[in-house]
Amino acid sequence: MHRLLAAVGMIGALTGSTLAQIAGAQPSAQAPGPTWPSKAMRIVVPWPPGGSADMIGRILAEHLGNAFGQSVVVENRPGASGMVGSAAVAHADPDGSTFVISGIPSHVVAPATSASAPFDPVKDFTHIAYVGGAPIVITAHASLGVRSLSELVASARRSGNAMGYVSPGVGSLGHMVGEYLARKDAIRLEHIPYKGGVQAVTDLIAGHVKVGAMTWTTTRPHIRAGTLTALAVSSARRFADDPGLPTLQELGYGELVTTTWWSFSGPAKLPPDMVQRLNQEINKALDAPDVRRKLEQEAIVTEKMSPAQFTRFVETEIGKWGPLAKAAIGAQGSGN
């Protein structure tokens, strides 16, 4: 417990000056040929179809296909908390045809907690563009009869058995949030990982598991239907469309002001001119009204970053979440 809380303490210690000291990756490569892209492009989504990463991959595939006049296909390659699909991209030729939807599970938590990670999350990738982030919502099945996070904590303390909670998978931000809450409040929560949010929420709404830590994207319809009760959200401010839902910060969990994020990366040593063009096109996509509308509907907040800024962001997230991930996952074993 003390190891995990110490790791969380490191999160708040990261400041702007710390971020400024982190060097961005500067891949060395030749400029792209004048005919690039000369063949179909592939965006690997290292998660199953139906989740936020999949939606973002398909949005970007459509935009880039139109922008470059080339076919762009989306390939779902889930497994090992996103490392299977990500490794395929890390080992691909840097010819501008293969990319990945990157994020916290695959490029921050999994590499930090695996003794045999098949890639370095910074050195083996060209980090091209940040897309956006969404907060985690703590939910309870209506049959549990709790209406607040404090009631959930009290219920867990009264229970003689560990209370199961679901997340989209090992190393997801929902996993991290749940593990921290368990130790902070000295309650017994058992992490039940799934291969994506769609499968996790299916069992949650069926009542097979009583607690969830997932994005607003996957839980909102069931919260509005009354099947799930929203208890707290990890955003810095309350949702405009659900102002009654308190933030974790308000409830005394200031370390958990955070979002799970999605981004666009490719193999290391992509030509800088190519990286810049891709960054510009993705930022254009984020400005498109239809794209903004789709992402806002899923509570995904976009932000534009240059490739250098995004690379520094990834490095900062590794320093921020890596120690916490090692403490949480190491404490409960790699099987979860």
Predicted region positions:
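A ligand-binding cleft/hinge motif common to bilobed small-molecule-binding domains
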Residues: S106-A115, Y180-K184, V211-L245, G322
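Hinge/capping helix and adjacent helix->loop/strand transition within the periplasmic-binding protein
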Residues: H91-S97, I104, A112-Q199, L248, ...
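An extracytoplasmic/periplasmic, membrane-proximal ligand-sensing/linker region
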Residues: Q26, S38-A40, R183, R224, ...
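N-terminal (or domain-start) structured segment
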Residues: Q21-K123, N161, V170, A186-V211, ...
